[in-house]
């Protein structure tokens, strides 16, 4: 049965398949307890890793874990989009079942159900720990799992099943050199503060997400985080790009992704900043489905990126955003204008100050003008 499952998974497009025991993950449980303040947010929503540390809390009859891995860096990513959107999101990993990755998962789940196999997937199982237990990868100091031939650009899906598939029970290990701290040095916010330790609330990616999708994600991004977000508007790859273990993968000559080449023509910071509902529904939502449930959060992130660019050419676009009906968009446009500075930015802020009735936006304008 295990071989039949493996062959089917490979046939429908997964790149690695492994099996692991369904025993609890005591090291993860201990880490979550030790760092409860950093990880309080994972006790809600789809993640609930505090429950998922024991797969049998998800499927009481669980006997094995199936771990599926897909290499999401098989095609190149346009330079216009890298540095703005994380590669995992550019690869459309988390789209619904009517798109390729979601369809692949549905096919696999249906395959198991047709054979009378019960499965559990929610709350989310600890994918990286499961992949390590199955012998499919090793940990990096940036907390990612590294898979031979893929680096850390590996999409992992774990399912608990009620059949014994002869799974592995390997210890989680790392193959990073003891003296390497490239990922830690590359993290501008200090989210990666020591090897294998991350405070997610300081992570750029975490702060670009939309509240509601992820518990405790702030609507208002702290000022000192904004300044360090650079051009990132959704996700962040800095710790992966800096890693020597990813160097070979990042330097590979890969075929282009035709879909992304088309999206790169329209998904620009200025287009996102001042997008209307039609642009959001036709250009953004099919591309970033489910990641950003309201356009104002992506407009917020685009404003931050434009402010961090320091480019005077962004000032007219940000001045226009000061007229947006959404308070959040106006507030972050004001912050961005203050970040860029100059006479034109100041004139736009002063013009809006006399007409603004939101205390939050006025606060941002006053700070920007000082």
Model feature map: region roles:
Residues 1-5, 15-17, 323, 347, ...:
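Long C-terminal interaction/binding lobes of large macromolecular proteins
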Residues 1-175, 359:
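Auxiliary alpha/beta "docking" domains used to position bulky ligands
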Residues 14, 182-205, 228-257:
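Iron-sulfur cluster-binding cysteine motifs and their immediate structural context
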Residues 146-171, 197-225, 278-281:
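Short, charged low-complexity linear segments at domain edges
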Residues 262-300:
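Glycine-rich phosphate/pyrophosphate-binding loop
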Residues 270, 280-285, 311-323, 342-354:
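Amphipathic alpha-helical scaffolding segments comprising HEAT/armadillo-like alpha-solenoid repeats
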Residues 295, 325-326, 357-358:
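Short inter-helical turns and helix N-cap capping residues of alpha-solenoid HEAT/ARM repeat scaffolds
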